[in-house]
A protein has these predicted regions:
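Sec-dependent N-terminal signal peptides
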Residues: 6-11
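C-terminal motif of bacterial Sec signal peptides marking the signal peptidase cleavage site
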Residues: 15-17
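A short, solvent-exposed, low-complexity linear motif enriched for acidic/polar residues
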Residues: 19-229
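Positively charged n-region of N-terminal signal peptides that target proteins for export
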Residues: 1-5
Length: 229
């Protein structure tokens, strides 16, 4: 809920939030592939295989500074810069940043139609599985081509993870003071590490493809890294 976690709409607000006497920190979420920043729609490579991620949506939950949860859930749309920048309240130094990857079990049973369109859990974000009556955690779509050139005979990629058993958490022990700028990076190459781009490009967390969803979910803690500036 964005009453305590507000989107950054301008560089001016970012700079103002980081001055002396600040009672907040800024959070920036970035994408990387093998440590190199990229944008949705850009062609990437794993060996000779070309990859293009055309949609990257996911949830982060129970975002906490120290022992204080500052936001129950946020929705990230990698093509919407406002969903990649936030301001979090912080009045004193803490030594830990923690968060969940996906939707926690309490929020995962919520009815998406009960929320306004600007709420992270709203049906407007198209992240709810009506057949499973729960949310997708990560929704990543795209294309791959083993020839190294996209455009002809591409193989579709759809990694949709969800279900409570696939929720993962991470704690980062690091000193954070009011006025700091936090950079949380999601490395997609780490996310699909050990996953075949030939035979494991599709999962909807159902019985026949659940093992792929487990692999991807187990990779999540290593795929996210935090830097404090």
């Amino acid at each position: 809920m964005r009453s305590t976690l507000l989107s950054i709409f301008s560089v001016a607000l970012l700079l103002a939030s980081c001055g002396e006497g600040s009672q907040q920190v800024t959070l920036e979420i970035n994408l990387e592939h093998n440590g190199v920043p990229f944008e949705v729609g850009e062609t990437l490579y794993k060996g000779d295989t070309a990859i293009k991620f055309e949609l990257i949506h996911f949830y982060l939950s129970q975002i906490a500074l120290g022992d204080q949860v500052v936001e129950p859930v946020v929705f990230i749309n990698a093509q919407d810069s406002t969903s990649m920048h936030y301001v979090l309240p912080l009045t004193k130094k803490v030594d830990q940043f923690s968060f969940g990857m996906g939707v926690d079990s309490i929020n995962n049973i919520q009815d998406p139609t009960s929320f306004g369109s600007d709420h992270p859990l709203s049906s407007a974000n198209a992240m709810y599985w009506s057949w499973a009556t729960m949310y997708r955690f990560f929704k990543i779509d795209g294309r791959v081509n083993a020839t190294g050139a996209l455009g002809t005979n591409d193989q579709l990629l759809a990694w949709h993870t969800g279900k409570n058993a696939l929720y993962r958490t991470k704690e980062v022990n690091v000193s954070i003071k009011p006025g700091a700028h936090l950079v949380l990076t999601f490395d997609l190459a780490e996310f699909y590490s050990g996953v075949s781009l030939d035979t494991e490009t599709m999962t909807h967390s159902m019985v026949d493809d659940y093992a792929i969803a487990v692999k991807l979910s187990d990779n999540l803690p290593a795929a996210f890294s935090l830097r404090v500036q």
